[in-house]
Curated annotation (Swiss-Prot):
This is ATP phosphoribosyltransferase regulatory subunit. One of its GO terms (cellular component) is cytoplasm. GO terms for biological process: L-histidine biosynthetic process. It is found in: Cytoplasm. The lineage of its organism: Bacteria, Pseudomonadati, Pseudomonadota, Betaproteobacteria, Nitrosomonadales. Keywords: Amino-acid biosynthesis, Cytoplasm, Histidine biosynthesis. Belongs to the class-II aminoacyl-tRNA synthetase family. HisZ subfamily.
Length: 391
């Protein structure tokens, strides 16, 4: 057996990539701290019921599970830190006002993402609790755009949706949960033939003609700002739909100067099991999958005894690091081994304080290649100076 082999889609991150990931993590966390988001560190393992709170069956399939040898209960390795942050807000902090939390750590999935091809993403996210207005949705989305900007992502396509459009269409229909899930699956996949069949056979006795037509129209409501105009013209005049469209229009108007492109997708039901309002995804050239996801999820705290308005975003730092133009591990300065030389020690301390990498060459390494150093300290005319490494 080759003991150095890793499981499929689990990988070591080597120095150059690890440095880039860590550099971006620090930039993003500094941005989150500057906006008042407080860092939390939830545990890697929790009881399954807690990790699945308000998340639906999809999360259950993505989660590794183990039996707790102390209690006999089933535990899970987190696949998403959002429910953990919600638990902390609802049960541990128990603050009545607005709470801003952020996190950054690894999560694990039973199967790899189709695009990133890893089962161990490094998730960074921010969550805002206790405010139900569109202003908090805007704060989260503006914050995400700033985090992407400091990470070196400058070409951004923002895609907006709103769960309440679909929910308002079926809210009073009295359809069975299994039909609702079939509808959701057809809309999410934009499977027009299945959607037509569902509306024609399984749902036509429950839905009015205007709602049937609206459901069939939803997959076509994708594109630029004309989508909202078409939605106002053809969707039922439900107050909740009108409010959702107003919110989308308002957010798009404010964020338009900061992104390259904004589109709308009224059939985007990603996270339907827990999202309750506006949802969004961010794309960038060179990656067909979203590089960040987020939205409003006002009911998730109910599972922990305290429902709170909430909105947030998350991204995979490993994926993000592959899309930036940031350089890998920086070159260093090679210093000789002279522990008794006070001038040398002072200069090394100064260089390190200025942010330079200084590597001390250990005895016996003089004739070996030292990777990562393109300069060296040399003693000249009574002073230590920096010279380029030649040869």
């Amino acid at each position: 057996m080759r003991n150095w082999l890793l499981p499929e889609y689990i990988e070591d991150v080597l120095p150059r990539d690890a440095y880039r990931i860590e550099k971006i993590r620090r930039l993003i966390m500094d941005m989150l701290f500057a906006h008042g988001y407080q860092f939390v560190m939830p545990p890697l393992l929790e009881y399954v019921e807690s990790l699945l709170a308000g998340s639906g069956s999809g999360m259950n399939l993505r989660m590794f599970k183990v039996v707790d040898q102390l209690s006999g209960r089933m535990m899970g390795l987190r696949a998403d830190m959002t429910p953990q942050a919600a638990r902390i807000d609802a049960h541990l902090l128990n603050i009545s006002g607005v709470t801003r939390l952020c996190y950054a750590s690894s999560v694990v999935h039973t199967v790899p993402d189709e695009i990133t091809r890893t089962r161990e993403p490094f998730q960074v996210g921010a969550e805002l609790y206790g405010h139900s207005g569109i202003e908090s949705d805007l704060e989260i989305q503006c914050l995400l755009l700033e985090c992407l900007s400091v990470s070196g992502i400058h070409s951004i396509h923002l895609d907006l949706g709103h769960i309440r459009v679909f929910r308002s269409l079926i809210r009073d229909s009295g359809i069975k949960p299994e039909f609702e899930m079939e509808l959701y699956a057809a809309l999410w996949a934009k499977d027009i033939s299945s959607l037509k069949e569902l509306v024609r056979t399984g749902l036509n006795k429950r839905l009015t003609r205007s709602v049937q037509n609206a459901l069939l129209l939803l997959p076509e409501l994708y594109g630029d700002g004309t989508v909202l105009l078409s939605a106002r013209q053809h969707l039922p005049d439900f107050p909740e739909i009108g409010e959702a469209l107003d919110q989308l229009e308002h957010v798009a108007r404010i964020l338009q100067p900061y992104v390259d492109r904004i589109t709308f997708d009224l059939a985007d039901l990603r996270g339907y099991h827990y999202h309750t309002g506006m949802v969004f995804a961010v794309y960038t050239p060179g990656c067909p999958a979203p590089i960040a996801l987020g939205g409003r999820y006002d009911e998730i705290g109910k599972s922990f005894g305290r429902a709170r308005p909430a909105t947030g975003f998350s991204l995979d730092l490993k994926q993000l690091s592959q899309l930036t133009d940031m350089n890998g591990y920086p070159s260093g300065i090679l210093a000789p081994w002279k522990p008794e030389d006070e001038k040398l020690a002072a200069m090394v301390r100064q260089l390190r304080a200025e942010g330079h990498i200084v590597v001390t060459e250990l005895p016996g390494e003089e004739n070996q290649e030292v990777t990562g150093c393109d300069r060296k300290l040399v003693f000249r005319n009574g002073n230590w100076e920096i010279d380029p490494v030649t040869g």
